[in-house]
């Protein structure tokens, strides 16, 4: 099932999403993101809805340098183990929301990524076991980064954690198949900047989940950002940045400078 989360006068709601004529449509209401059946409703294109982040995580676990070409473009060594960091839930941004370039940073970069939502409490998993019961679904994310602060600080909490620095959405696909790898692209103002495949992960999803859950418990709803391919670059006020993976729609956000 594919679903979205959107704002209504009565509060946030979940809705079933279907593809029609190349566009995503809301076709039913869901009582929760784990529901298996939807109450039919008159179809509405998602472009007419006020979309929200479909994930409400207790934590956002991210993987750095998980594509060989990205590690090389930044002049970094290829990690021998997954390189983990966090983004705070307060950094979440809805599809269509505005990424704010903080005054504290002179360079803010985009990083398009595949994101995985955890579906079942996970602790000390094995990469050899069937991990599908622990996966709720997949969505898109943009790991926005204050690149100058990342280099200056040495650790990444501030550079990755500003408000609006984690756009997520627009939909979740609970049956998304990662077996053969999927193509991820990022465009800025319509110009292709990133093109990669999850088949090129240095650490595949089973290895990531085993490594992460050896250290911490993942709760239902937690978000895992799996890394970004080569091509990252700066954003300036007025830009529009779009992350796409076939089947997951388009995650588009605009950019503005902090004004207060």
What are these regions (language model features)?
Residues 5, 10, 40-50, 54, ...:
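Catalytic-pocket segment enriched in acidic/His residues
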Residues 113-117, 139, 185:
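Residues embedded in well-ordered beta-strands
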Residues 98-104, 121-126, 151-155, 169-174:
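Glycine-rich, charged/polar anion/phosphate-binding loops
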Residues 123-138:
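N-terminal accessory regions of nucleic-acid-interacting proteins
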Residues 104-108, 160-163:
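Short Gly/Pro-enriched turn/cap motifs at secondary-structure boundaries
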Residues 2-103:
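Extended, compositionally biased flexible segments
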Residues 94, 109-111, 219, 236-237:
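Residue-level recognition of short, solvent-exposed, well-ordered loop/turn junctions
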